[in-house]
């Protein structure tokens, strides 16, 4: 993988980082940060294989695009713009759920508050092992560029 800290697209300045969740979690893991087990996949059979390999029973099937709000987004057909389903992050309880969610996510467009009405085509999934959540915390960081 190329260095994500050196920028990617020509219009991105030095230090810009634009990577998917699965790539970020790989970097965290390599740096010794504890992350849930997960696998990147690009097709439905890959998602089912990831579910089997993770062996956790419950998994999150996550669309991978460069925008936030995936969980609250709406998936639409890229041609007709007909609604496919709500949410680009789904909790799967079994293999059939994984297959269904992967089929509905991959190859379709997800529209979120950050993508605007055009949305973004989903070509990548991250299948992540589930866990029991006793407490949930959120962290936000604001960079003051002034």
Predicted features, each with a name:
Residues 10:
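Cationic, low-complexity basic patches in intrinsically disordered or flexible, solvent-exposed regions
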Residues 2-5, 15-145:
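Active-site nucleotide/adenylate-binding loops and adjacent lid/helix of ATP-dependent enzymes
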